[in-house]
Amino acid sequence: MELILLFFFLMALLVSLSSSSSISDGVFESQTSVSGRNLRHAKKKCEVNFEYMDYKVLTKRCKGPAFPAKECCSAFKEFACPYVSQINDMNSDCAQTMFSYMNIYGNYPTGLFANECRERKDGLVCPLPPLYSHNLNASTADSTPRFISLLISAATAVFALLVLT
């Protein structure tokens, strides 16, 4: 009986921890890469429309010529973290598209965020996403998978309690 409880507890823990909560270091490759030939497979179109985003959180806090690292990185995380799962999807063009529009609206030097914004070896730490964010519309909501994960975790815990009683 204790083994069954341990199994369900571990499953619930694994499901709840499976969501990404950091911006991968790999996304910065699209910001630092120089134009040239690329033999990689075609990437799917990003489901987040970065073209019409409000870039003021970046452009008001991350200004040249100094581009203070603390302000720029903080603003970058505030802007990018709500879309962490889309940006980290290396099969989509989300990171490349986001950095393109950031550079258009902010006129940032190439590699600014890649070179200045380092927290861990695997990237920047994002706070866990809320279950619902007013910044996301229904087609880009990354809260739905998180909600499902939490629902599965809760159901597993309830099932484990029922088995024990």
UniProtKB/Swiss-Prot annotation:
Complex and partners: Interacts with FER.
Entry annotated with the keyword Glycoprotein: yes
Lipidated residues (GPI-anchor amidated serine): S139
Origin: domain of life: Eukaryota
Positions annotated as propeptide: 140-165
Tissue expression remark: Expressed in leaves, buds, flowers and stems. Highest expression in the synergid cells of the female gametophyte.
Ranges where the record places region Required for its function in pollen tube reception: 82-93
Any one of the GO BP annotations: pollen tube guidance
Span of the signal peptide: 1-20
InterPro entries recorded: LORELEI-like
Topology versus the membrane: Lipid-anchor; GPI-anchor
Protein name in UniProt: GPI-anchored protein LORELEI
UniProt xrefs under PANTHER family: GPI-ANCHORED PROTEIN LLG1-RELATED-RELATED (PTHR31533), GPI-ANCHORED PROTEIN LORELEI (PTHR31533:SF31)
Subcellular location as annotated: Cell membrane
Reported phenotype of the disruption mutant: Failure of pollen tube arrest and fertilization. Deficient in pollen tube reception by the female gametophyte.
Protein's job: Female gametophyte-specific component of the signaling pathway required for fertilization. Required for reception of the pollen tube by the female gametophyte. Acts specifically at the synergid cell surface for pollen tube reception. Plays a role in double fertilization and early seed development. Component of the FER-regulated Rho GTPase signaling complex. Acts as a chaperone and coreceptor for FER. Required for localization of FER to the plasma membrane.
Glycosylation sites: N137
Alphabetic keyword roster: Cell membrane, Fertilization, Glycoprotein, GPI-anchor, Lipoprotein, Membrane, Signal
Cellular component GO terms, alphabetical: plasma membrane; side of membrane
